[in-house]
Amino acid sequence: MVDSSTVLIFLLVLGGGQSELDTKITSSGEAAEWEDPDLSLQGSCQPVPSCQKCILSHPSCAWCKQLNFTASGEAEARRCARREELLARGCPAQELEEPRGRQEVLQDKPLSQGDRGEGATQLAPQRIRVTLRPGEPQKFRVRFLRAAGYPVDLYYLMDLSYSMKDDLERVRQLGHALLVRLQEVTHSVRIGFGSFVDKTVLPFVSTVPSKLHHPCPSRLERCQPPFSFHHVLSLTGDAQAFEREVGRQNVSGNLDSPEGGFDAILQAALCQEQIGWRNVSRLLVFTSDDTFHTAGDGKLGGIFMPSDGRCHLDSNGVYTNSAEFDYPSVGQVAQALTAANIQPIFAVTGATLPVYQELRQLIPKSAVGELSEDSSNVVQLIMDAYDSLSSTVTLEHSPLPPGVSISFESHCKGPEKTEGEAGDRGQCNDVRVNQTVDFWVTLQATHCLPEAHVLRLWALGFSEELTVELHTVCDCNCGDAQPHAPYCSDGQGDLQCGICSCAPGRLGQLCECSEADLSSPDLESGCRAPNGTGPLCSGKGRCQCGRCSCSGQSSGRLCECDDASCERHEGILCGGFGHCQCGVCHCHANHTGRACECSKSVDSCVSPEGGLCSGHGYCKCNRCQCLDGYYGALCDQCLGCKSPCEQYRDCAECGAFGTGPLAANCSVVCADVNVTLTLAPNLDDGWCKERTIDNQLFFFLVEHAASGIVLRVRPQEKGVDHTRAIILGCTGGIVAVGLGLVLAYRLSVEIYDRREYRRFEKEQQQLNWKQDNNPLYKSAITTTVNPRFQGTNGRSPSLSLTREAD
């Protein structure tokens, strides 16, 4: 006997596989509806089966939570649409669930100068909460006031290699002069001092014991052993202490040209307690006469461990781990300076200035100045750099969480603005004391954040910051959650946001049927046409508990209506001037047509004289339909008729220049024409181009005014006849080019001949003539000796035979 489930599966295959078996759903109630979005409407609001998915699908989407909002056979996903569409379909405004992003200012102390810079409020607001809906930007304003006399901490970091010997003598007397100059702009200033040379390993310094003890060239000079970085003096307001500690310093020495300045900068930025940085403007003056080592150079000395980005100063202020960690990279240095809110000033000699100017592009809010050979201009250099850095306001941000973007609009001088790219900084230059600048910050999220994120915004070089509490809205707050709701078939499901989430084993829009009823033919009959033929739900949905659950934009008892099948105009459904309902466009009040493509307005058909299509046609869909023989946008032109340019040419000529065929009676013939001279900046297609009776070109524009015809004529430009100059110039140019080619040819031949002659002379000098035999020559004389013949003197005479060579 054949199992009933086998028969059912066989029938499903014959019927295209559409059955209630396809509609089994979980307790969430979402799998009963499929998604079939119109691909031509990607990026707009598409039907989705839940409120949460709806608000996350597109920022323009809203959800109608009204009970019984969807019609019979209409998918619950139709609750998701644009606000205007839902209101037009009868959803009350109070039943719309459309959470929006929002902002809440938590702390906003007013901007103030404070007492001589102390206690100033330069950045406002101080704390804000921003809630983002994915895809929807949120924009808020940040204000900055440059206060006068803002406190400054300045740390002087000096290269003490031997080549900086004369510079050290200047710096020993620097403390008082530097404090005096800085106190001119701020009453609260502190200075500190640190020095550097290089890593104490080969090949950076000599490891010969005597050289390690005294690396200077002369044994008579005062010299200290090489070191990487030494923090000498913490930040202080005592100028005498600065000069006293610097006076105790001596130069050192190393082998290679680049110095270990990056190690020193990184430690000065990381060891904030040892340096004594306050929460004020921080300046780091870096002086050197050479370039710097960077990440990877340490491998030359057998150092492979990358810099760990931590402070490694001992109790004496010496960087003790220089032989263990490689030099930091430019990115590490820039990140450490930015995190510590330190503004570096690179005071370097002219030979290395281009290198540090390139480095300046990679480190935010840094300055570069050219140092004289003996550092005599260092005070003025520092003051110039301080003025430049203080007048530049750069709004920086902490790292963003994944999926969140940021952009800036900098309003530096009134309404003028400079837009930055996403992730860029806001910046204003040349900001004066007591001047306020605005930054508009835009935040946008692409998806939900797993948890709240704290974002910091601050102006580089200043201590204040704005804290942004970043949240995302990713769920609906319908307020109608009801477990075992009577609305859902007497408690067969939970009600939330207007739809039922069925209990296990229950199905349907209202959880009205069970899984045991899926194979009932009576249920499927409710999803077919009365004649019993055709696919279930017209092939546009699924049969669910004897009722059709339609997909996409389909609706109706049998999903026979498709709200996305209406005609389109210029690729837009119903031309954008109506809504589609069951395959028919229902147009707005001022439009008509199968695709609402026809406007009932006649504004584009009215001619300047006030007539409709110039009296030579009729207006249809806000466009003139001309009668036979007429053409033009307003039917104002005809075959054989004069164009406006031809019609008013003589009046324009006589009225503007007093010439032409109408010059004698211009005021009579052209009485209804007003001619004015004008200097048009450019001539577009509307200007007439005609010639006067003496063949001079002129331009005029025909305008229709209430008082009559107005001709705007452009005055003739009196030019100079350049014919002779053009002819002479062309002739002279041809002659000059010819002479140039001949001279170039003769010059190339002369150069070639001289080169060949020199080569010939060189070969003659290298010749070494000597006499030698021809290896192919064979002598014609042959000598033969008779071994048995004994002469009188005991010698065997030789017999010489002469033969001719072949």
Curated annotation (Swiss-Prot):
Topology, Cytoplasmic side: 746-806
I-EGF domain boundaries: 478-512, 513-560, 561-597, 598-636
Descriptive protein name: Integrin beta-7
Chain's role: Integrin ITGA4/ITGB7 (alpha-4/beta-7) (Peyer patches-specific homing receptor LPAM-1) is an adhesion molecule that mediates lymphocyte migration and homing to gut-associated lymphoid tissue (GALT). Integrin ITGA4/ITGB7 interacts with the cell surface adhesion molecules MADCAM1 which is normally expressed by the vascular endothelium of the gastrointestinal tract. Also interacts with VCAM1 and fibronectin, an extracellular matrix component. It recognizes one or more domains within the alternatively spliced CS-1 region of fibronectin.
Binding positions (Ca(2+) 1): 163, 166-167, 289, 373
Segments of this protein annotated with the region Disordered: 98-123, 786-806
Gene: Itgb7
Keyword flag Ubl conjugation: no
Family matches, as Pfam families: EGF_2, I-EGF_1, Integrin_b_cyt, Integrin_beta, PSI_integrin
